[in-house]
Amino acid sequence: MKDMERMTKILWIASIVFIVLSGCTSPKAQQSELTLSGLNPINFETIVNGNQFTKLYTLKNSSGMEVCVTNFGGRIVSIMVPDKNGKMTDVVLGFDNITDYQNIPSDFGATIGRYANRINHGKIAIEGQEIQLPQNNFGHCLHGGPTGWQYQVYEASQVNDSTLILTMNSADGDNNFPGNVIARVIYTLTSDNAIDINYSATTDKTTVINMTNHSYFNLNGNPSQLATDNI
């Protein structure tokens, strides 16, 4: 009888252990499939401003090119293309997680807006009215101000393997720029290993718009070497 009770207890404990282990997820299972550039998409998932979700989107073409984009700032995170010897190489600088993009001031790969580059003394004149913009760079307005579009979350729609559409709404008075603006960026990979970036914007007031991408390139994929060494 004691042996029977002992066996029953062992089986009961074994069952509990099995259930607990079955409910656990191994570190390998928690990790998403890595991109060709070695990025883990999970490291780009977070919530900004309470209700805006960030993600990493992976674009590919028929030739094997891969481009990773996060909807935080519409940023290109990596571009994997074959070099002259056919070796796949990441030719842009960037971070491997969303936290660094949030906490380390940079324009790596970002979609810049409303206005790329500097506006002298942060002043513009529209329809006879002078508007004072934030002076966030030595007395001038740089890249749309301190909270430019490179720090905003875009709505993302990946329509196919090689095309991503990013959209954002910029309210009237955003960094003191006039007009409600709906901005759109379309990233498309072509079959000949090029990336096409198409910008468009609509507004309900006269305003200034000058969008661009702020990627930093190094063609041999090694940021410790000068780009001039590849020419």
Give residue ranges: language-model regions:
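Intrinsically disordered, low-complexity regulatory regions of eukaryotic regulatory proteins
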Residues: 1-3, 31
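Hydrophobic helical h-region of N-terminal Sec-dependent signal peptides
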Residues: 15-18
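C-terminal motif of bacterial Sec signal peptides marking the signal peptidase cleavage site
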Residues: 21-23
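An exposed, glycine/acidic-rich loop-and-rim segment of catalytic or binding clefts
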Residues: 25-65, 71-231
